[in-house]
Amino acid sequence: LKKLISKYHITLISLGNGTASRESEQVIVELLKEIPVKVQYIIVNEAGASVYSSSKLATEEFPQFDVGQRSAASMARRLQDPLAELVKIDPKSIGVGQYQHDMNQKKLSEALGGVVEDCVNRVGVDLNTASASLLEYISGISKAVAKNIVAYREENGRFEARNQLLKVAKLGPKAYEQCAGFLRINDGKNPLDATGVHPESYAAAKTLLERLGYTTEDVKERRLDGISKKISNYKKLAEELGVGEITLQDIVKELEKPARDPRENMPKPILRSDVLEMKDLKPGMILKGTVRNVIDFGAFVDIG
């Protein structure tokens, strides 16, 4: 492990919270005391990792790895981009409470799938890096179309504009209308493609920028922070631009902070370098925790 840390300049270790997690944590802590460079670790929820590691998708992604190695790779990816990795498994595999197996499984699957879809669309997806597993949760994109997008990207190179999606097999105008606003293109031909502004609203967005003394280049350089303060009457301006008031508010939010990630407002993960034990806990301490399970007599909260 020391050799791997030195060879690949490791600075952060992802440690699963499953079987022998505590023992593994102790080994890592002792190891970190012996090396000169600063390396930290974080406990990652490994629910569903075994399901992924034995799946067809995992075999396709890591044909040269065994099941254990695939699980390890998944743990590391969950730390890098949890949303992109967790979409690869059935949400039921994560564990959603004591009574999940007593429910109507069809309705449960539909509800959980809807939540995942809402999360993916709310965050948005980078069109040039997203896997087919992630793309298929975007509104208007089926599994087949998601694979076609990846195939088009591999054959023709990166997407430079959103409207290139219309060249993808089986992705028609209606599907494009549904998905375009949730797909981002960084460093593309049009800076608006990197925002959540829908192509249907591009004309209104450009007119708005001109009125406020800006250009799309200012969007690219992120020089539009605070433009909402320059608008005194949203209703009147929306009528002049030919869009709804709520649509205008959404456009302004996107222009102010393009490619903003709603997850940025969530508590940051705790990076650690030593083990937290029961004896370290004192009355009155305030700790951050994750609810792992809710049962009839209470809840299990993981505080590390």
Predicted regions, residues:
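Phosphate- and other anionic-substrate recognition elements at nucleic-acid/protein interfaces
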Residues: 1-113
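Conserved, well-folded catalytic cores of nucleic-acid-processing
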Residues: 4-11, 16, 30-38, 47, ...
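Charge-patterned, long linear interaction tracts outside catalytic cores
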Residues: 81-152
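Flexible loop/turn segments at secondary-structure boundaries
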Residues: 20-24, 49-52, 158, 186, ...
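Short boundary/loop segments of OB/S1/cold-shock single-stranded nucleic-acid-binding domains
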Residues: 263-285
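Short beta-alpha connecting loops at secondary-structure transitions
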Residues: 12, 54-67, 96-100, 118-120, ...
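S1/OB-fold single-stranded RNA-binding interface
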Residues: 280-304
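Accessory alpha-helical DNA-binding modules that contact the DNA backbone or grooves
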Residues: 122-265, 272, 300-302
